[in-house]
Amino acid sequence: MAELFNFEMTATDGKARTGVIHTPRGEIRTPAFMPVGTAATVKAMMPESVRATGADILLGNTYHLMLRPTAERIDRLGGLHKFMNWDRPILTDSGGFQVMSLAGLRKLTEKGVTFKSHIDGSRHELTPERSMEIQRLLGSDIVMCFDECPALPADRDRIAESMRLSMRWAERSREAFGDRPGHALFGIQQGGLEQDFREESAEALTKIGFDGYAVGGLAVGEGQEAMFGCLDYAPDMLPVDKPRYLMGVGKPDDIVGAVSRGIDMMDCVLPSRSGRTGQAFTRHGVVNIKNARHQDDPRPLDENCSCPACSNYSRAYLHHVFRSNEMISGMLLTWHNLHYFQDIMAGMRESIAAGTFEAWQKTFHETRAQGDIEPL
């Protein structure tokens, strides 16, 4: 019998890979971009709208859901999939990053992290064991092990200490996760921008054994050049037959650069957050729909995009509803952005399978460099 969760690589082109992650809830085509459903919703989107963009999988946030409405309540109500009406796979993060970035009065120990909720100031403790329990209650298809992600820049001693703590937590996460057929546990490589620490982390994780591996600790302020420098070697240290997930990366240029370096999965709030603030991603770069140049423009955001915003509405209309603070503005621009990101992923999958990924990248970068269409 086939495994309930497995990764099938179907083609490579250079370091870039395309394939399918098989799960009981459906297939995830890779490279895959995961929209972020922070509080059991992708902001400004209905679940069926997210499905229509081409998304195979969503990301949920353990930290936010454990605080409100709580994992126990979601479990009583039938699990996260039923709660938010999403019938495809869900990956949940471990909560570690949000604890470090959002929570107040944190105390880090070998056991875990105690912190105050950013919502009401209540005290909580998050450990590898508790993180695994929360993600089990949520019913996540892909569970992330609990880790610490230090902000960059940081000195080598701090990075080493943090990475080794995360590796001990990874072992505890693996033990607490147990044997759950159909559910996957991913380990998270840490080590900052230090190649030797990345190698040490990868060796520790591989020895423990996971269903997939994430490259963590990037997109935390180091800049694209430094991130790409790390990605030139970090994914190569991870098992070739398992999915590789780059956490929290979502600018189009970053996504394409990551895939060219062997990454299979990514997530980011950028397309939805930008949509709500009047920014649309197009083949020609970012369009700020709030700008007055769009107020009399009858053309779509992108004439080659088939999303509802581009198929049915003009730039002038999108400008108007944004300036009028109408809810439909965030809905249409978020839908467009998520559709565009999924178009990028589909283009990469097709070109990798055809062996034309280098040419696809060239066209992608040249088109973006042209900038937005001239105003009327």
UniProtKB/Swiss-Prot annotation:
RNA binding as annotated region, ranges: 248-254
Presence of the UniProt keyword Transmembrane helix in the record: no
Gene Ontology biological process terms, A to Z: queuosine biosynthetic process; tRNA wobble guanine modification; tRNA-guanine transglycosylation
Cofactor binding note: Binds 1 zinc ion per subunit.
Cofactor: Zn(2+)
Keyword tags: Glycosyltransferase, Metal-binding, Queuosine biosynthesis, Transferase, tRNA processing, Zinc
GO terms for MF: metal ion binding; tRNA-guanosine(34) queuine transglycosylase activity
Domain of life: Bacteria
Catalytic activity: 7-aminomethyl-7-carbaguanine + guanosine(34) in tRNA = 7-aminomethyl-7-carbaguanosine(34) in tRNA + guanine
Pathway of action: tRNA modification; tRNA-queuosine biosynthesis
Binding site for Zn(2+): C305, C307, C310, H336
EC number annotated for this UniProt entry: 2.4.2.29
Residue sites binding substrate per the record: D93, S94, G95, G96, F97, D147, Q190, G217
Family from the record: Belongs to the queuine tRNA-ribosyltransferase family.
Subunit structure, interactors included: Homodimer. Within each dimer, one monomer is responsible for RNA recognition and catalysis, while the other monomer binds to the replacement base PreQ1.
Function: Catalyzes the base-exchange of a guanine (G) residue with the queuine precursor 7-aminomethyl-7-deazaguanine (PreQ1) at position 34 (anticodon wobble position) in tRNAs with GU(N) anticodons (tRNA-Asp, -Asn, -His and -Tyr). Catalysis occurs through a double-displacement mechanism. The nucleophile active site attacks the C1' of nucleotide 34 to detach the guanine base from the RNA, forming a covalent enzyme-RNA intermediate. The proton acceptor active site deprotonates the incoming PreQ1, allowing a nucleophilic attack on the C1' of the ribose to form the product.
Protein name: Queuine tRNA-ribosyltransferase
Organism: Ruegeria sp. (strain TM1040)
